From Swiss-Prot:
Lineage per the UniProt record: Bacteria, Pseudomonadati, Pseudomonadota, Alphaproteobacteria, Rhodobacterales
Name by which UniProt lists this protein: D-alanine--D-alanine ligase
Cofactor note: Binds 2 magnesium or manganese ions per subunit.
GO annotation (BP), single: cell wall organization
The keyword Manganese appears for this protein: yes
Family matches, as InterPro entries: ATP-grasp, ATP_grasp_subdomain_1, D-Ala_lig_Van_CS, D_ala_D_ala, Dala_Dala_lig_C, Dala_Dala_lig_N, PreATP-grasp_dom_sf
GO cellular component, one term: cytoplasm
Residues annotated as binding Mg(2+) 1: D261, E277
Amino acid sequence: MAGLSSLPSRVVVLMGGPSAEREVSLSTGRGCAEALRGEGFDVIEVDPGVTHAGAELCARLQEIQPDVVFNALHGRWGEDGCVQGLLEWMRLPYTHSGVLSSALAMDKTRAKTALKAHGLPVVDSIIAPKEAVVAAHVMATPYVVKPNNEGSSVGVYLVNEAANGPPHLSDDMPDEVMVETYAPGRELTVSVLGDAPGDPGALTVTDILTDGWYDYDAKYKPGGSRHVVPAQIPQEIWDACMDMAVRAHTILGCKGVSRTDYRWDEARGLDGLIILEVNTQPGMTPTSLTPEQGEAVGMSFGKLCRWLVEDATCDR
């Protein structure tokens, strides 16, 4: 961990931005900014806006001269290596993962390929033209259709056995989409902090309970889902979740914090545990999983945000 030379330090919290996950990012950013102020940091909130205004952001950061940039952006531009490259070019220390790992994890197909090459179980999927997906079933139901490079369950469609035809996708879905086999079972997740000896590592396992599909509302609206922390699961499954999360974090080259999401089909035991995806910018809203896991292991939300700031470096 790269500690800061003096406190309080000036921290810019990047939030909002141009992606479909703008509202989630604004919620994350406000919460993190408040927590960091409570930890004694001089915090300035900066929203790059919705127009990919890189030049304007550079000018604003040059004006502020922050010691650290806390990246609370989600989705395209903020989570895919773009803003990370800009910050490295400006030689500004920043939180979370770097250019390569952010780009790799954001591209779900390539991330799965990397994880699978290292022996980790992932959900089978294909990339298909949007026009083909809306014209006919491209795989046996049930299956899931989603953008290859968005998160927070934005633009995710579940096509089940009862569907009479292919899904009707919204106009803002990309020309190519990911279609993946639906993985049944319980939704489990593990957050990982750091990548060096002495760092917290894997925190704990959460079991996410919902009354139906774990969609955007279930993730972010109060009462949309119930979280059991720590998860009440067999030790073998617990150990596998913790181990695979650290391995996935390492394989993709993640820095700071990541969160690995799973499905577990209880009837199949260990063979039923499969990775859905790895998030390099996990949500930090009041209902988010990573802050909740931190609290469960004795790390307050403020201390979690502080840890990320003190972990910030210029070359991630």
